[in-house]
Structure formats: C-alpha cells, structure tokens
Amino acid sequence: MEALTMPNSFSAGDSPFYQFPSPAKLNLFLHIVGRRADGYHELETVFQFLDFGDNLSIRRTTSATINLLTPIEGVSNESNLIVKAAKLLQEKTQTPFGAEIKIKKVLPMGGGLGGGSSNAATVLLALNLLWQTKFSYNQLAELGLQLGADVPIFIHGFAAFAQGVGEKLTPVHPDESIYLVSKPNCSISTQAVFTAKALPRNTQKLDIKAIDNKNYLTGYHNDCQNLVINHHPEVAKLLAWLVEYAPSRMTGTGACIFSRFDSEIEAKRVQALLPPSIKSFVTKGVNQSPLHQVINHLSIE
C-alpha cells in the first residue's frame, strides 16, 4: 500500500489538533494451532473492527517532545503504548517534530478489544501523516509489531484472517453484523492466559479457502474461552446469560463478550436487561477501520 502523503503547504510549524478514531476489534474466532520455539503462540483468527472506540486528538509540534496531555489512570506515560508508538516512529524517521496527544478513553482495559494496540496504531498512522514521514503501511506495521502482535491489523485497517502471531493477514469479508459487547466485572491478563498449562495449543489449522464468512459464531471457537470461564465465574455467568438471547462468544483473551443480533433494536432490548454493573455498548462490525476512513479522506487546508 502506498505511503500516506500530505499537501506541501503543510510543511512547517505547529499544527492544530486533529481527531482520529481508535476503534475496537473483535476476534470472531481464535484458534491456537501451535507454539513456536521462542515461546510465542501460532494463531489463526479473524479480526473485524467495530464502529466504536477511543478518540485521539493529535497535533504536531516543532518541539521534539512527545507529550500525552491526558494520562491514563494506572498506566505511566513511559509505559503507555501511545507514547511508545510516537517515540518509536520519531526514532526510526529522525523527524525533528514532536506531538501533543489527548485521548478520550472509552474502551475497557483487559477486555480483549485491542484498545492499547489500536491506540498505538492510531498514533503511528496519524503522526506519519502529520510529520510527513511517508512510511508505507507495511513499514508502519513492522514498527507496530514491536509494540504488540495486534498492532499490524489496526495499521492495515481491513478485516482479515490472521496467522502466525497475528501478523500474516489475508483480507476477508465477514457480515457487518450488529453486536452487543458486554464486559464482566473483571479484567483478564493476556499473559496469564497464554502461559496457562491448560490452554489448548493444537487446534487443527484451517484452509482459508474454506472459511465461512457467515458462520463464525457456529463453525469455529475461541480456544481461550473455556480456560477463562473456568477461572473467572463472572465471565462464565455473563456468557451463560447472553447465549440465551443470541449467539455469543468471548473476544480475544477476554473478558468482553460479543453477541450478534439481527437488528440494533433487538440488541438494545437485551442490553436494557443487563444489570447496571455490566458495562456494555451496541455497535456494528465493519470491514474497514473507521480510522482509515478518516485517514483516507482527511484534507488540511
């Protein structure tokens, strides 16, 4: 894919703040097909984006400083993927510019929705544009992989069948369904899931040509789900309740559960029945990232 470009008239000085979405993702299924010698797991999964997520406000500065103006509770700025992504691109491109970044955080941490990876990808794509560093999507994805296995899918921005550690992507076209996404009152450690002895690691590999784009919730599974529900009764209880209303599955390593509905009205009807303590939202699955819709249409006067 071609590198992002900006008009030559935007070539110096501080910029205004620009708004960039940082969408959530779903793993419509997640199969673990092996483990590499370096300890990383070989995965097969289908990623789809959600028309819902965090929002980042980003501006370019003539100072080389990377300044996150809205720190996230419990996460130091230096360990935040937002700051790490900006500094990594700055280092690799040797740009003289810096950035000021604000985030409106709505995606839960420890939910399996890819919030941190999405934030990192949004920063890489936005600053590549604002700094005019002209890296290609493939180059940005290589940088992103240093930050997390899910970052490349957010860089490329299309629904995909992913293999390897999640970096080998083949476009797919799942139905853009309506989902109710619900979060139990717990957070799941991805590291704890992937280091658990009870985690299945030998699911048979799929033939991508035979993948059914319409039946992800019936023909496939999430290898992490049984492990998580056995250790987290909050997840087990919520999942058991949701499947009475719609096909439902945990995304990623959890804890969020997505339920597919035929209409927004029906999804919101079930959402209204959830206990107030369960955070949830209704949205649509989309096969192009909302971030890329902004990047592709952004014009600066």
Describe every region a protein language model picked out:
Residues 28, 56-58, 82, 116, ...:
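Residue-level signal for inorganic ion chemistry
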Residues 49, 145-146, 153-155, 170-175, ...:
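Solvent-exposed alpha-helices and their adjacent loops that cap or buttress functional pockets
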Residues 62-75, 145, 212-221:
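Short, basic/glycine-rich phosphate-binding loops at helix/coil junctions
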Residues 98, 124-161:
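Contiguous, small/hydrophobic- and glycine-enriched helical/loop subdomains that border
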Residues 102-131, 247-261:
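Glycine/serine-rich anion-binding loops at beta->alpha junctions
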Residues 156, 160-247, 260-301:
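Conserved, helical-rich catalytic subdomain that frames metal- and/or nucleotide-binding sites
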